[in-house]
Amino acid sequence: MDIDTHEIEDRIKGQFDHGHATLFWEDEPGEYAEIVDALDLGNSAIVDVTGAELSSKRTILRERPARSLVIYRSGPKPRPQDDFLYDVKLAATPFTCKMEGIWASECGVPMPLAAVLSEHGSFFNSKERRGALAATPLPKGDERALRLAMLAACAGSRAEAPRDAVRDVVKRLLVDLGRGQGKTLRTIRECGLAATLWPEVLEVVGYAAPAGEDPTPEDLALRMLKARCASLVHDGAPLKADASRILADLAANSRTRDSYDALAREYSDAVSSSVPTGERTMEAVGTNDAVPVFDDWIVADMLGRALDGALRAADARAELNLRLHTHWFEDYACQYEALAAGAAALEGIEAYKGTCTAMTTEKGIFEAYRADWYRVDGEYRRFVGAMRKAPAGFKRRAGELVSQVDDAYGKFLVDLTDRWQLHLMDAGTYPPADIPSQADFFYEKVEKEFPSAEDGKRLGVIVSDAMRYEVGADLAARIASGALSLGRARVGADCEAMACMLPSYTQLGMAALLPRGPMTVDLTTENVLKGGGATDGLANRQKVVEAAMPGAVLLQASKVLEDGLPPVEDAPLVMAYHNAIDKRGDSRDTEGEVFAACEDAISQVAKIAGELLRAGCGKVIVTADHGFLYQDREVEEFNYAAVDGLSDLAHAPGQDVSHGRRYAMGTTLPKSDILIEYSSAELSLNGAGRFAFPRGITRLRLRGSGARYVHGGASLQENVVPVVTIQRVDSRRAAERTGVQGFLTGRPSITGSTVTLDVYQTEPCSTKVTPLTVRVGLYDPDDASRLLCAEERTLELASTAQSSEERKTRVTLHVTDDVDDCAAAVLRISRRVGNTNQFDAEWEQRLSVNRAFGNDFDF
């Protein structure tokens, strides 16, 4: 006997407790015949019908000795046509004391299949597996279905459909393999299900081991990785699209990504060796991201083209956007950004050469810089920032490109600065009347807003030390693209330019931004008096501003970032002084971090602007005291201006002389051909001081200070500062995201293994049109979440190209066998909702499914 008397009693009572009123116990060997009468079933009854089926039938049906009844019969089963109790047997619940019968009863397996379970005894040693088999929604009505359900239980699958169950089993095998484990495969083998596993994998994935060899998870993983990049790898019979579907699921799931990454790296060489050398280009690889070496190929291809001068900036940026949502992008992001920014910087410099000669006035040069030339500075900043983060190997390979960009940018700065200095005094004084001036900022941008602007709401001003124009323009572009969120309110931003005072150093710039008044520079301390009052420090500036605007509040931005905004309900004006760029740039030890400081400044200023808007400011205006010059390479000897006698004068007693890297001031200055000298009056200042600036981008020698980051001189990078206006806007004025439309390349039917469409970006991106993230996939028309292709494709529509052809992206989706369950499928493009992770349908096309014919010819 498999079980003792007490266990039999407990099992029978358990069946009754589950609501089974009649149990039919078929005991063919008769091994329990002697103990049947001794069973204690309480208020239930047991009827032994052995040899007396017909007479017992009356007892069972008419007299029924108890509400809960066990019908016991020993000996061979009669044929159905000879069985007097066949109808009773069909109506009753089968009961058995054989282990396979017990397992069948416990796990919801039909009794006719109980014999199958005896082949897999180890499976039932686990309560967890028995529970999973009992709870599974998978069919268990035949031997194959039953074994597949057991296989799914071994892998912990909760799938409802057989194909999904096989996918789950394969995923579990690959996860184990990627983590150096083999638990699932060992369990499958111990349970006697290995013979079931590989035929099911063949059916769903299409994988079979080479002739004469046994299938293994290792071979399966390699074949699946090759299948995921079948457009590149032409190696043997292709697998089904489900292979790519399984890998895509592993890669996308944060809990299994580590396993996918481990497998992709382990088999990367084996996959890549199957790709012809001629197809290792950015065009051939496309969006394929099965293994990381594909990104290495693209980066190498782009770098080679950049060094040859054959990489268009638009192509580099398009490639970055194409790879933006691929699996390994984060590992290569800085390399893509460096190549795109480097190409854009070089291209922008070439464009400058073609237009600069046409600008022959101070205003013309200023306007050209404000409108276009400033982009070179931004691309150079992005290039240097990306190169700083790039891995050492890429830095070595890109050394020649770095030299090209540094050389070209240095020449650009020299030429542009020479032109600016040549026309600096065209109007006789600086700043000229036809260029917006920092000295007029408070009147034009603050006082004119009151008392009625924005229905009396307060105004916010953020002064970010050394935020040059290109950084402010970047800030405005990011906010316009949605970087600043105020709940459901839309926030817009635009950037204007104005000329700062000369010399372009902190004390003078900060004074110029205060209410109007004559300014005088103390030639010894470099502090500035305005209207006779001191302007250095927050307390002195508070006095000056409050005299013009009672109730105004001035703050240090660092306090706002740490503690939040204090109560400002009664303040008509809130001014916050921010210092991230100049703080790091002005130190010799940290000047190399200045571009990283620019990124910090953008995020910090945006955060402070949000605080001010939430506090009731109708507008927030961001500006700066001055800009800066920065070159990442060490300053060479010829870039220093040697001025005889300047250092001696600066240290001589009784001489009011001081100087920085880019300016000198005093009542008397040494005469030198390498200095441009102006009087206070020429620079719109009071006093008898003289001010001199090195020609071009040369620096004055100054002990103890850095030389790569400088300001104070006369260059557009130092002299043009932003005026960024940030405010809530209605939907008509807010920047809109570009649109998207799909174009199917063939007939609206699925007859093969792929579906191809062109994803069209309807408008080029600009300051008024922002990029859009879309997702492309094939779905069940009755279940929008059910995917019918190997994977969804995520695209970043960010092209600025005017040509509609350049704004098209071709997408090929590989159809899984799930599509054969449907009469139709829906091809859908969904757009990201704001900055969330949600997507809404934007474009759809219904496709009929007719693969019975097409598959015969789909190679």
What positions do the PLM features span?
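…; additionally, a secondary subgroup of soluble metalloenzymes is captured
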Residues: M1-L459, A466-V620, A624-F859
